[in-house]
Amino acid sequence: MTANPTSIHQRLDRRLSGFSLEQPFYTSPEVYALDLQHIFYKQWLYAVPVCQLAKAGSYTTLRVGAYEVVIVRSRDGEVRAFHNSCRHRGSLICKARQGQVAKLVCPYHQWTYELDGKLIWANDMGPDFDASKYGLKPVNLRNLDGLIYICLSDTPPDFQTFAQLARPYLEVHDLKDAKVAFTSTIIEKGNWKLVWENNRECYHCSSNHPALCRSFPLDPEVAGVQADGGVSKKLQAHFDRCEAAGTPAQFVLAGDGQYRLARMPLQEKALSYTMDGKAAVSRHLGRVAPPDAGTLLMFHYPSTWNHFLPDHSLTFRVMPISPTETEVTTTWLVHKDAVEGVDYDLKRLTEVWIATNDEDREIVETNQQGILSPAYVPGPYSPGQESGVMQFVDWYAASLERALAPRQVAAE
């Protein structure tokens, strides 16, 4: 179902607080285009862990809507991002998802770029051709303590405030000393907002995530912040114990709701996301104390949520690919010197979240199918169980409302 001529502003104005969005926000190509234009093309997006680009010439590619981006480590050690489009006639330069190169060479006419984006060879372009004017177009990039974020906008929003807040939480995890143990990419046949809504609550966990529930707590007093923003005594005691051991833990939320950090406890006696609750990696990534510090939960809308544990870390990247399809990439990080088969078993490390991701995929797809019905109308969220969903939807609605000023009407 496409959006009707009613303005998006009017749909947002009549949105009931505590209810899901109207159907076009989950189904309409026009609303999807607005989401890309005003959110994904303007906000800082998580891309990859920096350890994925370990050597000069290591690169990865990323598609954000219509944009193609290549991220590469240069010979000076800096990681840079460029539009993955040759300045000659526009061909993709790097076609693979990741790789290792000496130079960035366009496969079409062999225009050749240095790893810092400078054009260094273009055959037979005439005596007046100035190669210095045809370097690759840069993309804004920030390295947040081992996590690479990019922004496609020529006028990127502030990143420093988030970085200053997050850095002390991340520093104890030593992500600069990480390596990628495994990466999983799945396509969920659901709108990107449904993927986020599902992530932001555990109302569904007990009936859908048997493996995750072996370690992730369902007790509302320790599983999250209360609907009014308060913290239970149990949770505050956990925060205080971690802080006393030198590990930042307190709940912090951005003023506009875009990002949040909090170090949440796992099930009693659980140390990591494994079937038995024991550590998945014997050589720990980071200096987190105490051993049962739980998981640092960090999200940054619209592209990432993360779990940083005492023994390993997981990053999740959310990327919309159509109005009803979303790519979810999960990366497991371990210490760079951890040896598979000695310090960790790959199946044991990954099985909980591989199962959980697939269960979430089915949930999101079933949710999307029901929303496609003409009978769908917005329904109420649970204040006690789905306050996180309400927080995400409020952030999304406010972000789109601000971006669309002056008022804009969606096409039929």
Swiss-Prot record:
EC number: 1.14.13.247
Enzyme class per UniProt: oxidoreductase
Residue ranges annotated for the Rieske domain, each copy included: 45-150
Reported cofactor(s): [2Fe-2S] cluster; Fe cation
MF terms (GO), sorted A to Z: 2 iron, 2 sulfur cluster binding; dioxygenase activity; iron ion binding
Binding residues annotated for Fe cation, in chain numbering: H204, H209, D360
Binding residues for [2Fe-2S] cluster: C86, H88, C106, H109
Keywords assigned: 2Fe-2S, Iron, Iron-sulfur, Metal-binding, Monooxygenase, NAD, NADP, Oxidoreductase, Plasmid
Family, as annotated: Belongs to the bacterial ring-hydroxylating dioxygenase alpha subunit family.
Described function: Monooxygenase involved in the catabolism of stachydrine (L-proline betaine), a source of carbon and nitrogen. Part of a Rieske-type oxygenase system that catalyzes the demethylation of stachydrine to produce N-methyl-L-proline (monomethylproline). Stc2 is the catalytic subunit.
Subunit structure: Homotrimer. The system is probably composed of an oxygenase subunit (Stc2) and two reductase subunits (Stc3 and Stc4).
Protein name as it appears in the record: Stachydrine N-demethylase
